[in-house]
Amino acid sequence: MTDKLFCTLFAAALAVADRDTFVSDWSLSSVWGDAPDADMPADRIDTLARLWDAAHLTIRDIRQHTGLSQAAFATRYCIPTRTLEDWERGARSCPDYLRLLLAQATGAYQRPRG
């Protein structure tokens, strides 16, 4: 998956509230460049489902994946503790790109290769 396609799909996943709708809408999309008579790759549905899940992880989900306390997570990733607390309680929102980076850095999401 190219970086450009990944960014397109991530943005689309953020905009769609229902996982199944996202997967069905994008699994047969022309963005993949499949030949008209080609079979869909077996892993595409799983890839799209995992990407949607990652787009909808909260910062708390990501932190809890690590098993770290708020203070330890904030220290490890150089995030002001108050900022992390605000994100977790919904007083402020963590930018989507930062949630994605943290999900990848912590292993909560592994981006597909290729």
Regions found by a protein language model. Name each.
Residues 1-53, 111-113:
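N-terminal flexible/basic segments that precede or flank functional cores
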Residues 93-114:
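DNA major-groove recognition helix of helix-turn-helix/homeodomain DNA-binding modules
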Residues 67-85:
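Short alpha-helical DNA-recognition segment
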